[in-house]
């Protein structure tokens, strides 16, 4: 059974810094700072072209507060892999966001390039997930979409990070 301590929250809000190792072969990003992504969620600064000089990927932690949601979006030309550390998220996905999948702590999810998706946290627990994407610029490929009419009830859910 995976156990998660509350240390992740403290680390998420500490100042981020990159630490170069002697010899220059690896870079450690001390997590801490975060930013509001176009997709409407708070992302902890992680590995990217900006923080580590990454050329083909980014890796960060996303949080979705209880009773909130992201913004419908796609990542044009980039794959995403997501591991849910804690919480439970309803993900609407596919053309017109017509498909619904529930992702729980311990689940992995793969999102192919260009697939629309929208995370919703209907629970009373913070969702924390680790996200890897083949976009080293992090936000470069994010294209936001409108909420489709069949999901209009989600207008009542605040966007996690407006």
Locations of the language-model features?
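Conserved short histidine dyad/triad with adjacent acidic residue
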Residues: 45, 60-76
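A short beta-strand-loop-beta hairpin characteristic of the jelly-roll/cupin
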Residues: 69, 78-105
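A short, N-terminal "cap"/entry segment at the start of jelly-roll beta-barrel domains
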Residues: 1-56, 71, 144-162
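A short hydrophobic beta-strand segment most commonly corresponding to one strand
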Residues: 59-62, 81, 110, 124-143
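Residue-level recognition of conserved beta-strand positions in structured domain cores
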Residues: 61, 74, 93-95, 121, ...
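Conserved metal-binding segment of the jelly-roll/cupin
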Residues: 64-67, 103-123, 132-134
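Short strand-connecting beta-turns/loops that link adjacent beta-strands
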Residues: 52, 77, 96, 124-125
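Structural motif
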Residues: 88-90, 116, 126
């Amino acid at each position: 059974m995976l156990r998660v301590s509350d240390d992740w929250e403290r680390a998420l809000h500490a100042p981020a810094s990159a630490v170069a190792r002697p010899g220059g072969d690896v870079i450690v990003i001390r997590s801490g700072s975060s930013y509001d992504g176009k997709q409407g969620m708070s992302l902890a600064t992680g590995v990217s072209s900006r923080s580590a000089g990454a050329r083909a990927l980014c890796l960060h932690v996303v949080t979705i507060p209880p009773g909130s949601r992201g913004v419908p979006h796609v990542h044009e030309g980039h794959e995403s892999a997501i591991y849910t550390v804690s919480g439970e998220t309803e993900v609407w996905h596919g053309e017109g966001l017509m498909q619904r999948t529930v992702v729980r702590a311990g689940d992995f999810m793969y999102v192919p390039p260009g697939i629309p998706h929208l995370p919703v946290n209907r629970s009373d627990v913070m969702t924390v997930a680790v996200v890897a994407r083949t976009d080293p610029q992090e936000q470069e490929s994010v294209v936001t979409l409108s909420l489709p009419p069949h999901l209009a009830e989600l207008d009542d859910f605040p966007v996690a990070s407006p």
